[in-house]
Amino acid sequence: DGPPARSIGEDVGGLFEIWNTDGNLIDTTDSIDRADTDIVLSPPENGSKFRYFQINPTPEGVPIEIMQEIAADAFEKIGAAHHRIDTSKHPAMHKTDTIDYIILLKGDVTLILDEEEVRLKPHDVVVQRGTNHAWVNNGDEPALLIAVLIDSDLI
């Protein structure tokens, strides 16, 4: 019924909140915009997040130290510094205790994982189960993805 209530990080890509749940109980009579809250990467316990996210192309020639600083700042702003457990493969590597359903809507993106890299084309679907990962835009235009993140107990 309108644009996303909240967004953050448009200068490097961005997160655009559509809907959030904070548990398993849903009040069907309230009219609260559940996306109009502070943006954090992960959903709360037993909660979920439904969002768009945009990945801008990485400018050529940016030193890895600068990319590390940008990534650290971006994750700090969304309460996710603790999710950056191993950034040796890419500065934006992170891991959440969630199951994620992600669809690439437009663009040319590579999903970097600990053991492999997967190049995606529009309409490809990714199911992530608590993996350490990063996204890289291979194109000249911003890439747009949509994601559902569901809090999970990983084993």
Predicted features along the sequence, with ranges:
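N-terminal leader/capping segments at the start of a protein or of a new domain
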Residues: D1-R34
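A broad, low-specificity signal marking well-ordered, structured residues that form hydrophobic/aromatic
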Residues: F16-E17, F50, I102, H133
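Non-heme Fe(II)/2-oxoglutarate
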Residues: D22-A35, V40-P43, D151-I155
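Conserved short histidine dyad/triad with adjacent acidic residue
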Residues: K49-T96, R129-N132
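Conserved hydrophobic/aromatic beta-strand scaffold that supports enzyme active sites
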Residues: Y52, Y101, E117, V125-V127, ...
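A short beta-strand-loop-beta hairpin characteristic of the jelly-roll/cupin
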Residues: S88-P122
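Ligand-binding loop in jelly-roll beta-barrel domains
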Residues: E117-K121, G130-L154
